[in-house]
């Protein structure tokens, strides 16, 4: 019975996420209903002492990343830097290679620290223009943007500042550059297979006489290239974030040691920080802050007058994203404490391979919740100890666990109820019926890539 209750709680959360209801509201409802059916007297203590404790821990660790990332993306947008980068890349590669152009420019922006949602809004007008000039069906735009923004630059490439690559650092005491070779191999697999798939889809459509089409909704205004920011200046903040993230990642342990103790006159105790667990987060926070200041310094003319309103929207968006994921993390903490979850853990433990075990667990929960960070948070909150013990027994480095968890989170997360998918289709004026098939193909490629990387590790031992 306890197992059925646990599954019912997961199914309920999946249902409300799919229907578009607030996870912030329904994650605690799902968790506490499960507790109510087990032990009614435990509901309030579990809510305060477990659900909220887990939620607070997540916010404490990761909210600054959500906040600084959102502000960085917003000032990049307001300054016109993102438009300049997109226009430059497409101009260099050409409209005749529209798909590769859009994928690469989305790669550049997301790997530089711009949020996925900002990339969708920044890239779409240029994608529409390039596809129109190349007479490529508009319905292929979402799949193309998904390959560029929702895949390997989010979780595979070493050093990516996206949250999916940062969450594992606190569980496995790694940094954002964990397992660089495996990450690059996975990224190359997704890129090559993704481009091959999209090219095949384009040629099939053109062979059938299908072009860009007419009567579309959400058609953007023609892009004006007048007064675009110098592309070198526009790229500078992305370079600053990437370089300083690496520098601070190296320097943090040298400056603070493995553990740091700080005392202040007004405190009767020392503040103790595990630099092994927090170093990657601190490094990215400082790098994003430097990136924001770089944009403000070089793009203040475009930002002036709109900074206040723009950053308000960014802060609101970061709060929503962080609280959504924190609620799912709290949900995972409660579910992991229920008797029924023991059955789930035992079933997963029966999978003899720890990396396959981790990949299946994380990508399944990402699919259920419709969130890469949410699914990974639930899985690692509940099962990271089990993953670590199994990996240590098999002499698998924590870096490999990190990379597999990050890549698996970006596997089945992009199912139809995923927020980024819904936003992408809304912005492009297309429907699930028209374009989700291609997004799902990229989703399948991302999922397969995790197991390709696992296979490469076992065959070669490369990390």
Predicted regions and their residues:
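Hydrophobic core segments of alpha-helical transmembrane domains in multi-pass membrane transport
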Residues: 5-17, 28-37, 66-71, 105-110, ...
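Core transmembrane alpha-helical segments of multi-pass membrane transporters/permeases
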Residues: 25-28, 48-83, 108, 274-340
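Long, contiguous bundles of hydrophobic transmembrane helices that form the permeation core
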Residues: 38, 42, 181-310, 423, ...
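Interfacial loop-to-transmembrane junctions
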Residues: 89, 424-445
């Amino acid at each position: 019975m306890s197992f059925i209750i646990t599954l019912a709680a997961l199914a309920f959360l999946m249902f409300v996420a799919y229907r578009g209801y607030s996870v912030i509201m329904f994650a605690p409802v799902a968790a506490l209903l499960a507790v109510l059916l087990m032990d009614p007297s435990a509901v309030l203590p579990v809510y305060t002492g477990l659900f909220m404790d887990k939620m607070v821990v997540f916010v404490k660790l990761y909210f600054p990343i959500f906040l600084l990332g959102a502000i960085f993306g917003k000032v990049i947008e307001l300054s016109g830097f993102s438009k300049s980068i997109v226009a430059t890349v497409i101009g260099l590669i050409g409209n005749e290679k529209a798909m590769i152009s859009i994928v690469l420019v989305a790669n550049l922006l997301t790997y530089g620290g711009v949020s996925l949602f900002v990339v969708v809004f920044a890239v779409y007008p240029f994608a529409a223009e390039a596809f129109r000039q190349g007479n490529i069906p508009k319905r292929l735009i979402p799949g193309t943007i998904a390959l560029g923004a929702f895949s390997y630059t989010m979780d595979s490439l070493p050093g990516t500042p996206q949250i999916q690559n940062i969450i594992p650092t606190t569980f496995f005491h790694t940094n954002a550059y964990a397992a660089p070779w495996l990450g690059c191999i996975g990224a190359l697999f997704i890129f090559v297979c993704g481009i091959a798939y999209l090219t095949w889809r384009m040629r099939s459509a053109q062979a059938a006489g299908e072009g860009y089409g007419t009567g579309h909704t959400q058609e953007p205004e023609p892009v004006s290239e007048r007064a675009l920011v110098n592309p070198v200046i526009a790229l500078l903040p992305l370079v600053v974030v990437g370089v300083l993230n690496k520098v601070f990642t190296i320097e943090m342990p040298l400056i603070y040691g493995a553990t740091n103790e700080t005392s202040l006159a007004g405190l009767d105790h020392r503040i103790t920080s595990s630099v092994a667990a927090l170093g990657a987060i601190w490094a990215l926070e400082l790098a994003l802050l430097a990136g924001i200041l770089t944009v403000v310094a070089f793009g203040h003319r475009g930002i002036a007058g709109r900074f206040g309103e723009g950053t308000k929207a960014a802060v609101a968006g970061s709060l929503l994203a962080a609280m959504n994921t924190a609620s799912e993390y709290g949900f995972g903490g409660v579910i992991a404490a229920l008797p029924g979850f023991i059955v789930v853990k035992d079933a997963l433990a029966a999978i003899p391979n720890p990396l396959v075990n981790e990949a299946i667990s994380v990508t399944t929960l990402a699919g259920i919740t419709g969130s890469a960070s949410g699914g990974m948070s639930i899985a690692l909150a509940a099962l990271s100890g089990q993953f670590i013990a199994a990996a240590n027994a098999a002499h698998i480095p924590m870096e490999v666990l990190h990379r597999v968890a990050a890549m698996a989170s970006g596997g089945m997360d992009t199912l139809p109820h995923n927020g980024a998918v819904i936003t992408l289709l809304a912005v492009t004026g297309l429907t699930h019926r028209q374009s989700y098939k291609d997004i799902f193909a990229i989703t399948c490629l991302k999922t397969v890539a995790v197991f390709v990387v696992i296979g490469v590790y076992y065959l070669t031992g490369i990390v």
